[in-house]
């Protein structure tokens, strides 16, 4: 298996960094089916998605494991931001880039979304008909986690309190220009 680091932009002008895995005995004159692999929330392409990419390349696919916008070696500020629009667009930008490679069969491009990227991959496949196959692994519904807390841990009262805090923080940011960045995982579940 050969690995090539590649860079390409999404429609939000964010530079994405990916690793393309080519199968053994790769022949640039042939047309290959391709798989785009999305990583778990908080991970990078060299971890889980890279392992899936290696295994699927071993099975004859050209694979692309990318760092999502704001993560790893990809661009985007502030770092570690979760933007559903950008993360869904990252899959379509990956389809764009792969489909421009002369050795890719444009009618055989699929996606594997792992954990947090699973939900974004489902959304991408529903919006982009160029994605011909979809698989998710341990898919996590980020929308539900945002609305209800991890493991549905928030009560209605806690949710209303959090929304009030978010509203107040938005006013502070509008007044001062200073963003408050916090990570979404509570210290105790």
Predicted regions mapped to residue ranges:
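N-terminal cap/lid segment of alpha/beta-hydrolase-fold proteins
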Residues: 1-30
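Active-site glycine-rich loops that stabilize anionic/oxyanionic intermediates
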Residues: 32, 39-44, 115
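The serine-hydrolase catalytic nucleophile loop
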Residues: 42-54, 68
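Glycine-rich "HGGG/HGxG" loop immediately N-terminal to the catalytic nucleophile
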Residues: 47, 69-82
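Alpha/beta-hydrolase active-site loop
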Residues: 48, 81-102
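Conserved alpha/beta-hydrolase
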Residues: 55-75
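Alpha/beta-hydrolase fold nucleophile elbow
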Residues: 102-115
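Alpha/beta-hydrolase-fold enzymes
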Residues: 120-189
């Amino acid at each position: 298996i050969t690995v090539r680091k590649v860079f390409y932009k999404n429609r939000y002008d964010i530079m994405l960094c990916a690793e393309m895995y080519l199968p053994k005995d790769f022949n640039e004159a042939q047309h290959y089916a391709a798989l785009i692999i999305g990583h778990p929330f908080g991970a990078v392409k060299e971890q889980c998605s890279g392992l899936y990419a290696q295994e699927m390349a071993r099975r004859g696919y050209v694979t692309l494991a990318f760092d999502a916008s704001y993560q790893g070696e990809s661009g985007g500020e502030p770092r570690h931001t979760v933007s559903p629009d950008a993360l869904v667009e990252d899959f379509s930008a990956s389809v764009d880039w792969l489909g421009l490679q002369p050795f890719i069969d444009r009618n055989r491009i699929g996606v594997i979304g792992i954990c947090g990227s699973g939900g974004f991959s489902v959304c991408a496949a529903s919006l982009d008909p160029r994605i011909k196959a979809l698989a998710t692994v341990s898919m996590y519904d980020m929308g539900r986690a945002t609305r209800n807390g991890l493991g549905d841990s928030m009560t209605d009262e806690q949710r209303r309190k959090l929304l009030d805090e978010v509203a107040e923080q938005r006013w502070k940011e509008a007044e001062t220009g200073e963003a408050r960045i916090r990570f979404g995982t509570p210290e105790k579940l």
